[in-house]
A protein has these predicted regions:
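Residues at helix-coil transition
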Residues: 14, 25-26, 75, 87, ...
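Hydrophobic ligand-binding cavity/cleft-lining segments
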Residues: 1-39
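Hydrophobic pocket/interface hotspot
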Residues: 20-24, 28, 52, 70, ...
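Hydrophobic-ligand binding "helix-grip"
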Residues: 32-33, 40-48, 53, 59-110
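Basic/polar N-terminal segments that are highly enriched at the extreme N-terminus
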Residues: 1-4, 148-152
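Short beta-strand segments enriched in hydrophobic/aromatic residues
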Residues: 13, 24, 56-58, 85, ...
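Beta-strand/loop substructures that line and gate deep hydrophobic ligand-binding cavities in soluble
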Residues: 6, 89-137
Length: 152
């Protein structure tokens, strides 16, 4: 896939990778959605092919389901999900309106951790739409929230 359809950001976190990973996966609701919005996990199956379902709630009652599947869940290193596939009412995979494949990755860097979030899109139009939706501000706020939790 061409990297022209990818958006990414990186943060250096002054905490060991083990702590960052723990916060990433066990305190997801505290950092995964930019405040004042909040995320609630509806269902999370931490394995490739597992459900990744949550709802984002806005400050005036908005609700935005965020459903998909994990493509990879590499303990201590990364998780990858997509909204291109969801589970239907019969419990089987169904196609959905794809926007992206999301990557959330960590790796040791000095005495801390490098956190990288990437969004790969099927088309340039989809990538541009994500930029217009506020990728840098929104995903940047989430990364900063994660950083603050890990460094506290």
């Amino acid at each position: 896939m061409s990297d022209t359809h990818e958006l990414s950001l990186t943060r250096t976190i002054d905490a060991p990778p083990e702590k960052v990973w723990d916060v990433m996966v066990n305190r997801l609701e505290e950092w995964y959605c930019p405040a004042p919005w909040r995320a609630e996990i509806d269902r999370q199956e931490r394995r490739a092919g597992g459900r990744c379902e949550m709802t984002f709630y806005g400050p005036v009652g908005e609700a935005m389901p965020q459903n998909g599947i994990y493509l990879a869940f590499d303990e201590g290193r990364r998780f990858v999900s997509t909204d291109a596939v969801v589970f239907g009412e019969d419990g089987d995979f169904e196609p959905a309106g794809p926007m992206m494949i999301g990557f959330w990755e960590i790796e040791p860097e000095g005495s801390g951790t490098r956190y990288t979030a990437r969004a790969r899109h099927w088309t340039e139009e989809s990538r541009k739409q994500h930029v217009e939706m506020g990728f840098e501000a929104g995903w940047g706020a989430c990364a900063d929230q994660l950083k603050a939790l890990c460094e506290a």
